[in-house]
Amino acid sequence: MEKFLDINEIKKIIPHRYPFLLVDKITELEEGKSAVGYKNVTANEYFFNGHFPEEPVMPGVLIIEALAQVGAVAILSKEEFKGKIAYFGGINKAKFRKKVVPGDVLRLSIELTKIKGVAGVGKAVATVDGKVAAEAELLFVIGK
């Protein structure tokens, strides 16, 4: 099932807010299974002031966080988890393959590969222009 969520609809599902909300829209959502979202990376991002002033690069940890936020939308849209919070449980196999710079459009996709009770695992991939920028296996747990 494909679903489009704008920023206001995303904010109804996850608690993140500026400056830590790192997803602009969700273009595909299969509740409890997968999601695809986008982040428009602009020169005005707060983190570019210090990372790095002469060569701005989006920190890898924030790319992973953006992927986790898309994953949170996927799992928290499932009826039994609506109104709850998804917490990071861990990160495995993280790889950073391409710099993300101002002007890039970051495509963030996640497939939830295992859910057991309130814990689960997702395979996440961030791309720019079809090239992998980062990938990781994200572990999560659902809180109250």
UniProtKB/Swiss-Prot annotation:
Please state the protein's primary subcellular location: cytoplasm
Reaction(s) catalysed by this chain's protein: a (3R)-hydroxyacyl-[ACP] = a (2E)-enoyl-[ACP] + H2O
Enzyme class per UniProt? lyase
The record's active-site residues are 51
The UniProt keyword set, sorted, is: Cytoplasm, Lipid A biosynthesis, Lipid biosynthesis, Lipid metabolism, Lyase
**Where is the protein found, in the record's own terms?**
Cytoplasm
* GO annotation, biological process: fatty acid biosynthetic process; lipid A biosynthetic process
Which terms in the GO cellular component ontology are assigned? cytoplasm; membrane
Q: Give the Gene Ontology MF terms in alphabetical order.
A: (3R)-hydroxyacyl-[acyl-carrier-protein] dehydratase activity
Q: What Pfam families does the database record attribute to this sequence? A: FabA
**Is Cytoplasm one of the keywords?**
yes
Q: What InterPro entries does the record tag this protein with?
A: FabA_FabZ (IPR013114), FabZ (IPR010084), HotDog_dom_sf (IPR029069)
Q: Does the keyword Lipid metabolism apply?
A: yes
Q: EC no.? A: 4.2.1.59
Q: Which PANTHER family match?
A: 3-HYDROXYACYL-[ACYL-CARRIER-PROTEIN] DEHYDRATASE
What's the family?
Belongs to the thioester dehydratase family. FabZ subfamily.
Task: Describe the function of this protein.
Answer: Involved in unsaturated fatty acids biosynthesis. Catalyzes the dehydration of short chain beta-hydroxyacyl-ACPs and long chain saturated and unsaturated beta-hydroxyacyl-ACPs.
For this entry, the protein name equals 3-hydroxyacyl-[acyl-carrier-protein] dehydratase FabZ
